Amino acid sequence: RSPSRGLGDVYKRQTNTRHNIGFKIIDAINLHFKLSKQKPKFKGLLTTGNIEEKKIYAIKPLTFMNNSGTAIKELIDYFKIDAKDVIVFHDDMDIDFGKIKAKFGGRSAGHNGIESIDKFIGKEYSRVRIGIGHPKQKKKVNNHVLEDFKEDEDCLLYTSDAADDLTR
């Protein structure tokens, strides 16, 4: 069993922002693998299904980013899943847009959603860091993260090949 988790923000006005890339990745995986319809559970929107005979639980927390660890904690406690089997998809400004880096464990690098998850389940889980690029000026960081994707950026997220690659 493998819970996947996408980090994002709950406000409708932030649906298409770079900060919500984790949610968009979960949506792409759900669509590509025809997982179940999202339903409210564990302080988030839960989708379940199988990918290559492996049970998948994908959740998009409906908490604020800073509290997103509560949703994953409730999910893994309920289904008795080890934290080491968790995969979290999240934005990373230190990586060029569209580039992906995966790692197991490690530090939060200042990402509030990751800090929240670390607090609730520890640091021993997989992270898939999706590059959103950096604005190069510190004062532009907040606007950059909360800006909507540009048209050419948005279309990159919904290719079936990307969903396939992210789940391997």
Regions found by a protein language model. Give the residues of each.
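Charge-dense, low-complexity intrinsically disordered segments
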Residues: 1, 16, 151
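Single conserved hydrophobic/aromatic residue that forms the stacking wall/gate
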Residues: 1-7, 11, 158-168
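Nucleotide and nucleotide-moiety/phosphate-recognizing core
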Residues: 5, 9-104, 115, 119, ...
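Charged/polar, solvent-exposed surface patches and flexible loops
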Residues: 31, 74, 144-148, 164
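Anionic group-transfer/hydrolysis microenvironments
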Residues: 62, 92-96, 131-133, 149, ...
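Phosphate-binding/catalytic loops
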Residues: 99-109, 114-160
